Amino acid sequence: DSLRVIDSNRVVWLNLTGSGNETAAHVREFNRMTLMFCAFEGNPLILRLYGTARAIHRHDPDWADCYTLFNPLPGARQIFDMQVDLVQTSCGMGVPLFTCAGDREQLIDWATRKGEPGLKQYREEKNRTSLDGKPTYIEGNSEPEIRQP
C-alpha cells in the first residue's frame, strides 16, 4: 500500500523507516530514479519506470498533501515523487517463479513499538547519511555528522 500512480507521468512511493536510507541521498544528489517491477507468476515480464524524483521528508511543506494519498503507516519516513520520462518492458524470462506466502508485518510492528520519539531518534542515528557518506536530510539537518567506521 505504498505506491500511487498519480497520472500517466507521475508516481509517488511511500518509504518506511529502515536500516539504510540510500535512495534519499542519491536522489538528492542525482535526482534520477528507476523503479522495477517483476512478474513472479503468470507470463514473464519486467516493467521499468525511468525518471527524475525528489524525496519529500516529514518536515517538508509538501509532506502533508502527499501523505494523504496513503493510509497512515507506522514508520513512514519519506515519500519519493517521481516524474516518469520513460516506461520500458522486457521479457522477464530470467525472473524465477515465486508464490507469495503473505506480507511481512515485522517492520510495522517494530515501528509501532518504537513510537514516534523512538523512530525520530533511530532515523537521526541510522538514516542521516548513506553508506558512502552522502547526506539524506532525513530530519531536516542541513549538514549531518559523518559517522566514522
Summary of predicted features, one role per range:
Residues 1-149:
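Binding-site signature for planar aromatic cofactors or substrates
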